[in-house]
Regions:
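Start-transfer (signal-anchor) and selected internal transmembrane alpha helices
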Residues: 1-39
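Active-site lumenal/periplasmic loops and adjacent helix-entry segments of GT-C-fold
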Residues: 26, 36-143, 147-169, 205-209
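Transmembrane catalytic cores of multi-pass membrane glycosyltransferases
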Residues: 40-53, 64-70, 76-82, 208-214, ...
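Specific aromatic-rich, kink-prone transmembrane helix
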Residues: 160-183, 192-194, 198-199
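Membrane-interface alpha helices of multi-pass inner-membrane proteins
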Residues: 174-176, 191-208, 217-221, 238-244
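Extracytoplasmic
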Residues: 387-464
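Luminal/periplasmic acceptor-recognition loop/helix of membrane-associated glycosyltransferases
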Residues: 443, 460-514
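Aromatic/acidic, Gly/Pro-rich catalytic loop(s) in extracytoplasmic/lumenal soluble domains
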Residues: 500-541
Length: 541
């Protein structure tokens, strides 16, 4: 009896050591992922008020100060119609008493960390090898700025948008599906099911469109992970058929579209596969081919899966198959219903090819796992060299996209971009109720780098061709005002003459415009209290 007691006595101590090792390994894992999140920001850059980031930021500023943007307000409110993003960020600003740029930066880093951490947890469900798991997440960190074929999306934007929340939430839902369909006790299964539903609910509140494609991905994954072959095949086919039928039904019941809306919709060439360039089409086909290959048995021989149950697809095979089926279905929907010549563009507006964000995520995880397991292995020098080499194209692409701006724009203080300087001057030297007009395509002016006037200057402005055109293409009620705004600014294009008493200046004043921003070379007799080598701010009334 004494011997038996002596034998049993060390077990609690061994259990404590085992738990301590697990906790320590988790701490190291979190630290590594935090370092990768910082690396991802350093590679991709950070531009909080550029492109879509400026659209969302303007909505946050409006909630914090309702006196901002008193004119043409619809273009400020449009991103907030069906998203809780702006109220959430505004609440964080109020709670933390930090500035909007500071909160946006913290949210950006946190969202990247959450994305990488969830991706690592997915990799941990797929492969036993630590090298494979770290390789998957390291490659994702290096390639976060990768463009998703011709969809006009990046895998992760270099600014904060509603996708900053929906992306990690969709990955968390996929993780929950993998755990729910594995061999876990019933109480834990219910917890994972609840986590899946909660993640998709948060994603839906932030970005309903991306959440919809996330729901499709989770449904496909659940079917493919079933132990019953009938569910695997019939469930997958049913999901694809349901998507095609739903798209056809939406196209059939869509209301007639105005001329202004059709004009706005046709400016979004990335909606239509027929408008894509050949290399963008390669960006659709190549990931599907890679993922189809990764769903085969050879892949499980190269990378040992965590689960080897007869009749049960491994997690990696299920995810690869899911992404392949999801991508093929999205292409079919786009080819059948998202066409420029279609009578309505409702399905095109839903942008089915955005589902390829998930496809690209899965492709990168699979490729990164192979890279870590067979090429990088345990050699620290190889890991460092690989991340430098693989991250370099994304870094160079960001510098090419934002050549006149800092790589990481934490604040506008000391900003060398001349357009941002002119927008800053407008914010500090004009009244809040001022209405501005610019070249409708100013966002593509040399050196402008895609920065949003509205978010930086915090002043009302007539709609532009690019970003406000995107809002008009999604919200049909904005199409007529958008077209009217473009017509009013048609003579503000580069090198156009703008005289104080000209009919065009009178037409702008009739709309309430009090200031214009022109390129430095544009001839005018207006008073321009601010100018630099790229732009000038002129009073028109």
């Amino acid at each position: 009896m004494a011997t038996s007691a002596a034998t049993l006595e060390p077990q609690p101590r061994a259990l404590q050591i085992s738990r301590a090792i697990r906790i320590d390994s988790r701490s190291v894992c979190v630290a590594v992922i935090a370092a990768l999140a910082i690396l991802a920001v350093a590679i991709e850059g950070y531009h909080p008020f550029a492109e879509d980031g400026g659209l969302y930021a303007a909505g946050v500023e409006r909630l914090l100060d309702p006196t901002l943007f008193p004119q043409w307000t619809g273009f400020v409110l449009a991103p907030m119609r069906i998203s809780a993003f702006a109220p959430a960020i505004a609440s964080l600003v109020r709670i933390t008493h930090l500035t909007v740029p500071a909160v946006l930066l913290l949210v950006h880093i946190a969202s990247i960390f959450a994305t990488l951490l969830t991706a690592y947890c997915i990799a941990a469900q797929c492969w036993l090898s630590i090298r494979a798991r770290l390789g998957a997440v390291a490659l994702l960190a290096c390639w976060m700025g990768l463009p998703v074929a011709g969809t006009s999306l990046q895998l992760i934007d270099p600014y904060v948008t509603a996708r900053s929340f929906s992306t990690p939430c969709v990955l968390l839902a996929l993780l929950a599906v993998l755990r729910f369909t594995s061999d876990v006790p019933e109480p834990k299964r219910r917890r994972w099911l609840f986590l899946c539903a909660a993640s998709l609910t948060v994603a839906s509140a932030m970005h309903p469109l991306m959440a919809g494609y996330g729901i499709a991905a989770t449904c496909l994954s659940a079917c493919l992970r079933s132990r019953r072959r009938a569910v695997q095949f019939a469930g997958t086919i049913s999901c694809c058929a349901a998507a095609l039928v739903l798209a056809g039904a939406l196209q059939h019941v869509a209301p007639p579209e105005s001329h202004a809306y059709v004009a706005a919709a046709l400016t979004r060439t990335y909606w239509f596969l027929q408008e894509w360039r050949w290399y963008e089409l390669v960006g659709l086909a190549a990931p599907l081919g890679i993922l189809a290959a990764c769903s085969g048995t050879w892949f499980t021989r190269l990378l040992e899966p965590c689960d080897r149950t007869r009749g049960h697809l491994s997690a990696s095979a299920a995810l690869a198959t899911m992404a392949t089926v999801l991508g093929v279905t999205a292409i079919l929907v786009a080819l059948l219903y998202a066409r420029p010549e279609a009578s309505t563009h409702l399905v095109a507006r839903l942008q089915p090819l955005r589902a390829f964000q998930t496809v690209y995520m899965m492709m990168i995880l699979m490729f990164g796992a192979l890279l870590g397991e067979y090429l990088l292995q345990r050699h620290a020098g190889r890991w460092i060299a690989a991340m430098l080499i693989l991250g370099a194209p994304v870094f160079v692409a960001d510098r090419a996209t934002f050549p006149s701006s800092r790589h990481i724009q934490i604040s506008d203080t000391g900003e060398s971009n001349p357009w941002i300087q002119s927008f800053d001057w407008a914010r500090t030297h004009t009244p809040k109720d001022a209405l501005f007009a610019l070249d409708p395509d100013y966002i593509h002016a040399p050196g402008e780098d895609g920065h949003c006037f509205r978010a930086i200057a915090q002043r009302s402005v007539l709609p532009d061709y690019s970003k406000d055109g995107g809002e008009a293409s999604i919200a049909p009620q904005l199409a007529e005002p958008w077209l009217a705004g473009l017509r009013a600014q048609r003579n503000l294009i580069p090198a156009s003459l703008l005289l104080r008493n000209s009919p065009h200046a009178s037409a702008l004043r009739a709309l309430g415009v009090s200031w214009v921003i022109l390129r430095r070379a544009s001839p005018t007799d207006l008073s321009c209290p601010y100018s630099n080598f790229a732009a000038k701010v002129c009073r028109i009334s």
